[in-house]
Amino acid sequence: MGNTLIAIGEALIDFIPAQTGCAFEEVTAFSPKSGGAPANVCGAFTILGGSSKFITQLGDDPFGRKIAGDLARAGIDTSLVSFTDKANTALAFVSLENDGNRTFSFYRKPSADMLFSAEQVKEEWFEDAYALHFCSVSLGDFPMKDAHKKAIAYARQKGAMISFDPNLRFPLWNDKKALHDTVNEFIPCLLYTSPSPRD
């Protein structure tokens, strides 16, 4: 087991509203911020003094380049981030309720991260892995799901812990049973999980 936290999954631009407590159509301005739950975990781990790497695929577009730059400036190793011209970087418009809860409107049909394939995952990436962290957003029926399976297999071979944040985003799943079955499919791989009250 090494000392680097590796996360795999989506990175996107969150468009944060200038106003809270109102519907999307009432918001007059949004600010673009780099986000995505797995990327945020890398950022938090780095702030706490740890070493982190992030595996994702971004669109070869201004949003993708912004995310890559923001990750690097946060101290996250971006050597495992790839780019594609086959799809754009994912976007999410956010509305904020007065109690702090959020509603998301996603633009990723498909997005670049969804097209990241198992063939792109390399065993040597996990030589210094302390833990591998992932979420459910990237486990739909597209290539990134198989990339997760391969990453988990390599990480377990290297003795790394496996951490899972369900982070259920129901609007991204047309079939709620498929989401339920997919989460259950990955649970046997885990050492840690971190569901929120809304999950």
What are these regions (language model features)?
Residues Y192-D199:
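Conserved small/polar residues in nucleotide/adenosyl-binding loops
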Residues M1-D77, F116:
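Glycine-rich phosphate/adenosyl-contacting loop at the front of the ribokinase-like
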Residues K158-A160:
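A short helix->loop->beta-strand "cap" motif at the edges of active sites that frequently abuts
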Residues D146-K150, K176-V183:
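Charged helix-capping and loop-helix junction motifs
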